[in-house]
């Protein structure tokens, strides 16, 4: 697996309606797929998430053994020792996937999309993966979003940011206060740690929302995406 590249990733792609000038990489949660995430978003919004100028890439994590499932095989971006914020990260698996997803970013750059026109984000584990990818390896992307996600207390992301002195991508973070799988307090802690390390970020909290996507959340995410990746008309205003 050490030599894995983006070629191992199945991907679901939603093409822009007009000229492609920006790209969005949207990472699913544990046990899901790129196609599954796209269909879930479509169900919540009652329509596909689409843009005039932004290509959306929904990759699928390659199947691997997952410790919280007693070693069962699942589509996960990395392994966890357990689902909590106070245990060590499984850095070996995180770093392998950072390289695989870096290859995916490089593919977009080779096709003519600048790094500052690429956004990375995800739901749950996908959001955690996006934060590792952007803040440890790609601090020149347009922005990062994390929906119902968290970082472990001693995360390698925090260690990387302590050594950083450049401009960091903004983080858009959302979390349901009723989430019982990934606690809202873990998201608050992640947000305050990143803020203290120089990341511009706001945590949007949603009362009565569990570990799920909500329409309100996706509506404000879409607006934020357009502020980070404006089309030609928006840039001229």
Swiss-Prot record:
The keyword Metal-binding does not apply. It catalyses: S-hexadecanoyl-L-cysteinyl-[protein] + H2O = L-cysteinyl-[protein] + hexadecanoate + H(+). Its EC number is 3.1.2.22. InterPro entries: AB_hydrolase_fold (IPR029058), LYPA1-2/EST-like (IPR050565), PLipase/COase/thioEstase (IPR003140). Its main location: cytoplasm. The modification N-acetylalanine is found at residue 2. Keywords: Acetylation, Cytoplasm, Hydrolase. The keyword Hydrolase applies. The active site is at residues 124, 179, 211. It comes from the Eukaryota. One of its GO terms (molecular function) is palmitoyl-(protein) hydrolase activity. Signal peptide: none annotated. It is found in: Cytoplasm, Cytosol. SUPFAM superfamilies: alpha/beta-Hydrolases. It holds the Pfam family Abhydrolase_2. Belongs to the AB hydrolase superfamily. AB hydrolase 2 family. Palmitoyl thioesterase that catalyzes depalmitoylation of CGAS and KCNMA1. Acts as a regulator of innate immunity by mediating depalmitoylation of CGAS, thereby preventing CGAS homodimerization and cyclic GMP-AMP synthase activity. Does not exhibit phospholipase nor triacylglycerol lipase activity, able to hydrolyze only short chain substrates due to its shallow active site. This is Lysophospholipase-like protein 1. The gene is LYPLAL1.
